[in-house]
């Protein structure tokens, strides 16, 4: 089940400096809510600057869905301190509102209460809001208010020089991209370990279904619906998985094939979405009627990425420079910390992603890619079930989940020793020891802890209590890295940048759409 990585680990142990210089970044989403937990209907607070142009404080789907972005960082502790400062600053500037501490929203009356994120009158700003209008019309607005954490990760050039024999990032871009695609294939095969350990959405408010039927066999406790062994309902079909994408045939074997599949999806008309219409009397319903409006609409638990240049699409950036980093998208909001993610999770992801790039990863057909989803679904819906098993490949053979998890951690511990040697401490090994215990004792998983702490209050009461507690805590903590002046200057710069974009928008929006979305 677990590939034999003993040779690769021995290589790593003899080349420890190859891992010196890992870079990371975090994106954390959170809904603004009222003291009663209802979705805020107020505009994005002006004191925070403009969501379109602020580098650290922006919005995602909804005007009330905040997104905090850390700069790229070589230190986990520094990165999380930066993220904490953003939370402290925002908490002080939300008035009565607070940040919802769970992935799944709760007290939403109707989809009409969800206001799309607003980005001003520039063509870029209108484009971003229209993309969200399309998502709402295609999949419903409620699905888009689910929050998560994204972990961006890149290995240093020294790793690729030692492991793949590349000279520099430019001439070695093909080998580096191949390495990251190997990582992605292993992530699809073994990434279910993330919702097993860290899934924190085993229950939802019944209002989330909004009267819709669900095929899931929910149990009810007051206003809470839950599955007894679930880990991450956010990653289930309740969340945003876009079933229409399952037939796209996009694979993760080679960069060119991946980009080709992506481009095919954004240029292939969809009869279903065509019925929504694109434009009527000057009012737009979506960017276009293709399977994907733009590349970001592709649902994926992990993405290959490169920083784009102005006007460049994500896939064109990949073709130009190869894969620069990967974005992990399977983390629920961690409700046990005010900032939604902690150092143990970051260190685990470092270890796991390094393991994924070292382990052999045979190429995967689109059928096998779908097949890996079965293990994910098993863990998402019944991960804590006693005696739970994991499928091996696309065959009928199974192995106990606990055994596979413990085998994986035996490898991760060796990676941890290398990283601890670089850092001169034992923190990665300590994380391994803490987390591997969850395969023997499921009560240590995040989802089990949520169920235990939720108790009779239900998920809504639990979220409200945490939201108030974290608001009080964040407002009382001093800034550690940033200061009020720096944050105020960034906010003002974002206002200036948005104003400049709006003054430059002389091209008609229809023309802009044709150029950027084939509209």
Swiss-Prot record:
It catalyses: L-cysteine + L-glutamate + ATP = gamma-L-glutamyl-L-cysteine + ADP + phosphate + H(+). One of its GO terms (cellular component) is cytosol. Pathway: Sulfur metabolism; glutathione biosynthesis; glutathione from L-cysteine and L-glutamate: step 1/2. One of its GO terms (molecular function) is glutamate-cysteine ligase activity. Gene3D superfamilies: 3.30.590.20. The keyword Ligase applies. One of its GO terms (biological process) is glutathione biosynthetic process. It is an enzyme of class 6 (ligase). Keywords: ATP-binding, Glutathione biosynthesis, Ligase, Nucleotide-binding. Disulfide bonds: none annotated. Belongs to the glutamate--cysteine ligase type 1 family. Type 1 subfamily. HAMAP family: Glu_cys_ligase (MF_00578). This is Glutamate--cysteine ligase. It comes from Edwardsiella ictaluri (strain 93-146). The gene is gshA.
């Amino acid at each position: 089940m677990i590939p034999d990585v003993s040779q690769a680990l021995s290589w790593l142990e003899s080349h420890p400096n190859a891992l010196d210089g890992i870079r990371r970044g975090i994106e954390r989403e959170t809904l603004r809510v009222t003291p009663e937990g209802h979705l805020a209907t107020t505009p994005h607070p002006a004191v925070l600057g403009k969501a379109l142009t602020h580098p650290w404080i922006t919005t995602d789907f909804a005007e009330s869905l905040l997104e905090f972005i850390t700069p790229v960082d070589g230190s986990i502790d520094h990165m999380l301190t930066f993220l904490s400062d953003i939370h402290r600053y925002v908490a002080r500037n939300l008035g009565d509102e607070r940040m919802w501490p769970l992935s799944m929203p709760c007290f939403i009356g109707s989809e009409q209460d969800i206001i799309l994120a607003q980005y001003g009158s520039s063509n870029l700003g209108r484009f971003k809001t229209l993309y969200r209008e399309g998502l709402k019309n295609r999949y419903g607005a409620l699905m888009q208010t689910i929050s998560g954490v994204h972990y961006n990760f890149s290995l240093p050039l020294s790793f690729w020089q030692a492991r793949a024999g590349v000279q520099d990032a430019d001439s070695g871009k093909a080998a580096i991209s191949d390495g990251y695609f190997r990582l992605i294939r292993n992530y699809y095969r073994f990434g279910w370990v993330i919702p097993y350990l860290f899934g924190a959405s085993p229950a939802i408010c019944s209002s989330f279904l909004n009267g819709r039927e669900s095929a899931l066999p929910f149990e009810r406790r007051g206003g809470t619906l839950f599955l007894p062994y679930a880990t991450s309902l956010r990653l289930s079909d309740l969340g945003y998985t876009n079933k229409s994408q399952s037939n796209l045939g996009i694979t993760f074997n080679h960069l060119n094939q991946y980009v080709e599949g992506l481009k095919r999806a954004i240029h292939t008309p969809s009869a279903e979405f065509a019925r929504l219409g694109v434009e009527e009397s000057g009012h737009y319903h979506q960017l276009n009627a293709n399977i994907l409006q733009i590349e970001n609409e592709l649902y994926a638990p992990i993405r290959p990425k490169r920083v784009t240049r102005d006007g460049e699409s994500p896939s064109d950036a990949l073709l130009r420079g190869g894969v620069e980093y990967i974005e992990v998208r399977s983390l629920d909001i961690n409700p046990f910390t005010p900032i939604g993610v902690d150092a143990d999770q970051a260190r685990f992801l470092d270890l796991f992603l390094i393991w994924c790039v070292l382990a052999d990863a045979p190429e995967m057909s689109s059928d096998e890619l779908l097949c890996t989803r079965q293990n994910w679904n098993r863990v998402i819906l019944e991960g804590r079930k006693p005696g739970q098993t994991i499928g091996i490949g696309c065959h009928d053979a199974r192995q106990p989940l606990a055994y596979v998890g413990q085998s994986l951690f035996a490898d991760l511990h060796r990676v941890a020793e290398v990283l601890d040697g670089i850092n001169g401490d034992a923190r990665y090994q300590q994380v391994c020891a803490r987390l591997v215990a969850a395969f023997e004792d499921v009560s240590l998983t995040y989802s089990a802890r949520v169920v235990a702490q939720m108790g009779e209050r239900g998920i809504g009461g639990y979220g409200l209590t945490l939201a108030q507690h974290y608001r009080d805590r964040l407002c009382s903590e001093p800034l550690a890295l940033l200061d009020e002046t720096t944050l105020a200057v960034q906010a003002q710069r974002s206002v200036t940048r948005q104003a400049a974009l709006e003054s430059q928008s002389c091209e008609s929006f229809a023309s802009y759409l044709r150029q950027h979305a084939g509209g």
